[in-house]
UniProtKB/Swiss-Prot annotation:
Assembly and oligomerization: F-type ATPases have 2 components, CF(1) - the catalytic core - and CF(0) - the membrane proton channel. CF(1) has five subunits: alpha(3), beta(3), gamma(1), delta(1), epsilon(1). CF(0) has three main subunits: a(1), b(2) and c(9-12). The alpha and beta chains form an alternating ring which encloses part of the gamma chain. CF(1) is attached to CF(0) by a central stalk formed by the gamma and epsilon chains, while a peripheral stalk is formed by the delta and b chains.
Source species taxonomy: Bacteria, Bacillati, Bacillota, Clostridia, Eubacteriales
GO MF assignments: ATP binding; ATP hydrolysis activity; proton-transporting ATP synthase activity, rotational mechanism
Keywords linked to the UniProt accession: ATP synthesis, ATP-binding, Cell membrane, CF(1), Hydrogen ion transport, Ion transport, Membrane, Nucleotide-binding, Translocase, Transport
Cellular compartment(s): Cell membrane
Bilayer disposition of the protein: Peripheral membrane protein
Enzymatic reactions: ATP + H2O + 4 H(+)(in) = ADP + phosphate + 5 H(+)(out)
This protein's record includes keyword Ribosomal protein: no
Binding locations of ATP: G152, G153, A154, G155, V156, G157, K158, T159
Gene behind this protein: atpD
Protein name in the entry: ATP synthase subunit beta
Family according to the record: Belongs to the ATPase alpha/beta chains family.
Length: 465
């Protein structure tokens, strides 16, 4: 009764005809299985066209499909395994393990389309999430259940920063992470998987991939698969979960491809008319509840560096903090190469983080801003032309700049220096002392790649010796 037949195939979109009483609902999964041709395809119902026909989006390649083939209405949406068994494994959009390991069997499966938590269940309080990374905690702090945009070009350290966040949350907070690779390079996913295994973090995270070579349906839905796995850890295990999405722009891009194939009229710049709705459906599920939280870090590609493009502009509306990585800073050998003046956070206010933290952060930014303004004069006329006050600002700014760097645990294998997790109190105290001029006598090199201010003092002694 619930078997239909394929009547039309247009690339990644397939029309299937059913008996009138057996029409599948929107978002239902429809399966096409032909063992002798090695076809095992899942479709998701997107539209009802009339005449008992539904239009579906394919989750994998439609190669080998023919009109007249049988399609089974499963009567349920795409469901994926959730729970502790997913940790340390890699999945595709359908929740099938793709790491050549054994099949994952869990007691519980969740549909990938779920409502966002009701307003009464959400936790209205804003609490800072300590990452142990000085530059982030001081100048652009993350909030539990918040959304963070990670901007940066190729090779400035996005992946290493993501790995360190996963490591610190796992080690210091015992928290779990889910990584969703959306429409990015398969090679990068493979590198990440190998690096996670080497750094020993893999047992604290689940990974879901729908990469560049996959059909748009898979790229559009893989973010929801990762989010669904994270929701289980939040709602059932009462965890604070980190959800990494790399790259949120590819989610929108896949939506645009699907929209065109479904015959919808394009909107501004050729994007889908449902752009804001699709983004909202994903982002609204990422939040804090009374049980736990999902904090999401989303890498955002900005097409042609145009921040007004509808795709990044729609993503911005949902963000609580932005972490901007700057190539000029990485060229100075300062890692993490986070731009202290471009990065910002909604929770950088005295009501949330406290008066002392706020004041130190603003003082640090003020000194760095003055230094930035003086750089042209220094480049043309040299340091000697500056007033005594300006020279003091420059010397403190250079110390602050270096003190914003720190050795990472996940980079220990390359650098040879042990990673440092710096508690927020130590971060505030260290920068406060530099701003107040207590360490003007220490050489600049003493502040580079250390954790706390005590380590800088020790390093200065070692340099002096």
């Amino acid at each position: 009764m619930n078997i239909g037949k394929i009547v039309q195939i247009m690339g990644a979109v397939v029309d299937v005809e059913f008996a009138s009483e057996a029409l599948p609902e929107i978002y239902s999964a429809v399966k096409v299985t032909v063992p002798e041709q090695k076809i095992d395809l899942t479709l998701e119902v997107a539209q009802h066209l009339g005449n008992n026909t539904v239009r579906c989006v394919a989750m994998s390649s439609t190669d080998g499909l023919q009109r007249g083939m049988a399609a089974l209405n499963t009567g349920a949406p795409i469901t994926v395994p959730v729970g502790p068994a997913t940790l340390g494994r890699i999945f595709n959009v359908l929740g099938k393990a793709i790491d050549n390991g054994e099949e994952v069997h869990t007691d519980t499966s969740y549909p990938i389309h779920r409502p966002a938590p009701a307003f009464v269940d959400q936790d209205p309080s804003t609490v800072m999430l300590e990452t142990g990374i000085k530059v982030i905690d001081l100048l652009a702090p993350y909030s539990k259940g918040g959304k963070i945009g990670l901007f940066g070009g190729a090779g400035v350290g996005k992946t290493v920063l993501i790995q360190e966040l996963i490591n610190n949350i796992a080690m210091e907070h015992g928290g779990l992470s889910v990584f969703a690779g959306v429409g990015e390079r398969t090679r990068e996913g493979n590198d990440l998987w190998n690096e996670m295994r080497e750094s020993g973090v893999i047992d604290k995270m689940a990974m879901v991939f729908g990469q560049m070579n996959e059909p748009p349906g898979a790229r559009l839905r893989v973010g929801l698969t990762g989010l669904t796995m994270a929701e289980y850890f939040r709602d059932v295990q009462n965890q604070d979960v980190l959800l990494f999405i790399d790259n949120i722009f590819r989610f929108t891009q896949a939506g645009s491809e699907v929209s065109a194939l479904l015959g919808r009229m394009p909107s501004a710049v050729g994007y889908q008319p449902t752009l804001a709705t699709e983004m909202g459906a994903l982002q609204e599920r990422i939040t804090s509840t009374r049980n736990g939280s999902i904090t999401s870090v989303q890498a955002i590609y900005v097409p042609a560096d145009d921040l007004t493009d509808p795709a990044p502009a729609t993503a911005f509306a949902h963000l609580d903090a932005t972490t901007v990585l700057n190539r000029a800073i990485s060229e100075k050998g300062i890692y993490p190469a986070v731009d202290p003046l471009d990065s910002n956070s909604r929770i950088l206010s005295p009501q949330i983080i406290g008066e002392e933290h706020y004041k130190v952060a603003r003082d640090v930014q003020q000194i760095l801003q003055k230094y930035k303004e003086l750089q042209d004069i220094i480049a043309i006329l040299g340091m000697d032309e500056l007033s005594e006050d300006e020279k003091l600002v420059v010397s403190r700014a250079r110390r602050i700049e270096r003190f914003l760097s720190q050795p990472f645990h996940v980079a220990e294998v390359f650098t040879g220096s042990p990673g440092k997790y710096v508690p927020i109190k130590e971060t505030i105290r260290g920068f406060k002392e530099i701003v107040e001029g207590k360490h003007d006598n220490l050489p600049e090199a003493a502040f580079h790649m250390v954790g706390t201010i005590e380590e800088a003092i020790e390093k200065a002694k070692a340099l002096g010796a």
